[in-house]
Amino acid sequence: MTIFDNYEVWFVIGSQHLYGPETLRQVTQHAEHVVNALNTEAKLPCKLVLKPLGTTPDEITAICRDANYDDRCAGLVVWLHTFSPAKMWINGLTMLNKPLLQFHTQFNAALPWDSIDMDFMNLNQTAHGGREFGFIGARMRQQHAVVTGHWQDKQAHERIGSWMRQAVSKQDTRHLKVCRFGDNMREVAVTDGDKVAAQIKFGFSINTWAVGDLVQVVNSISDGDVNALVDEYESCYTMTPATQIHGEKRQNVLEAARIELGMKRFLEQGGFHAFTTTFEDLHGLKQLPGLAVQRLMQQGYGFAGEGDWKTAALLRIMKVMSTGLQGGTSFMEDYTYHFEKGNDLVLGSHMLEVCPSIAAEEKPILDVQHLGIGGKDDPARLIFNTQTGPAIVASLIDLGDRYRLLVNCIDTVKTPHSLPKLPVANALWKAQPDLPTASEAWILAGGAHHTVFSHALNLNDMRQFAEMHDIEITVIDNDTRLPAFKDALRWNEVYYGFRR
């Protein structure tokens, strides 16, 4: 069972009574066939539910109104099988607050050259019915996605499935609660921001809880539960000698397990699916949560360090979007560089908190080592390298008048040397198009030092996310050239300035 099982997408057919009852009967038959086939063969993440034909303004308005109030409905897929005059859609689309995709398809793939007549033409009018629908969307300035292709085409299936992931993610985001244990790292700018504006724009709420409230729950965890979780650690990870039974750091592992159980209980009781910590607010905790955070991220929670609620929320959103896809998604930070002509590299990591979903090793190492920051006992953590291949790093920043999403396409590579003295998980990558261009563009656009790293999602996924939430996106990839990138930033200032 995944989050997608909690939602469905409504399949709505637009038509009109001009063509007579026989045509509408055939439209209904075609729709039933297409929906059944898509649910059976297209490997869509959500179930499609066919709704009654929309042939009048009142029918269409009722469908849109019902979609708004049905918590299971993640969005609408609309197919204009025949011509459907778009003025009939105005009232419904005006009130619709769920994502909308126009599937520009038709029942037949090939034209029946020898038998085609006007009855066939009247029945299969997607080619211009879809354009009428597109006009009213443009006229109303209503954002919606469009997928063109035959309903049996695998590429069309993939694009609809990708959009469904976005639609479900948007509904989940509207209910997302972000818990901040403590406040921001002191004096840091990019991790701060307008929480009210974020809730208005995205729907997620951000509130702070004292670390003492968490400590109270952590201290209530029984020794039996702690021992059971440590047994799980023993089976899932390669334990260093210091962390094994009778090892000198065994007690630190037990404390890490207690923190994990306490954090999870606190988050579950509060209905939180994203959270932050900061090493400056640890009063009452025996160690900075490292292992606990790593494992909670792997279970789907959003997280970011130093109170960075925007990145924590973005990680949760991207975790939902990527559910069931190959590859992992994690909190990340650009940490340090390797400068070598033609082979510039970025080493990404954090103090402790990198999600094991991106690990190359089947069984990461569980170790306890010293951490000077935070002033607490040595924390437990998982240590691993990262899978290789194409990936992205994404950052969501608050510019005051709007939100900007930055995405850099990267290529993760194998670490060329062992890192015997680096006691944290890490990722090594080549930034596209090259490190000087990527880093300069990122800095000019105001990108944060915290990011969400993902092998599972790609640039197109993040473009869809930005469009669905109506926010700015800046892209750094192999096509990026700094002069054009700077121009785009200037144009965006003008565009979004006019929209205020």
UniProtKB/Swiss-Prot annotation:
Q: How is the cofactor bound?
A: Binds 1 Mn(2+) ion per subunit.
Q: Which InterPro entries match?
A: Ara_Isoase_C, AraA_central, AraA_N, AraA_N_sf, Fuc/Ara_isomerase_C, Fucose_isomerase_N/cen_sf, Lara_isomerase
Q: A biological process (GO) annotation for this entry? A: L-arabinose catabolic process to xylulose 5-phosphate
Keyword hit for Isomerase: yes
Q: Which residues cross the membrane?
A: none
Q: Which UniProt keywords apply?
A: Arabinose catabolism, Carbohydrate metabolism, Isomerase, Manganese, Metal-binding
> Its catalytic activity?
beta-L-arabinopyranose = L-ribulose
Query: Where, by residue number, does Mn(2+) bind?
Result: 306, 333, 350, 450
Q: Record's SUPFAM superfamilies?
A: FucI/AraA C-terminal domain-like, FucI/AraA N-terminal and middle domains
Its EC number is: 5.3.1.4
Similarity annotation: Belongs to the arabinose isomerase family.
Record's function text: Catalyzes the conversion of L-arabinose to L-ribulose.
Q: What is this protein called?
A: L-arabinose isomerase
**Organism this protein belongs to:** Escherichia coli O17:K52:H18 (strain UMN026 / ExPEC)
* Classification of source organism: Bacteria, Pseudomonadati, Pseudomonadota, Gammaproteobacteria, Enterobacterales
The gene from which this protein is expressed is araA
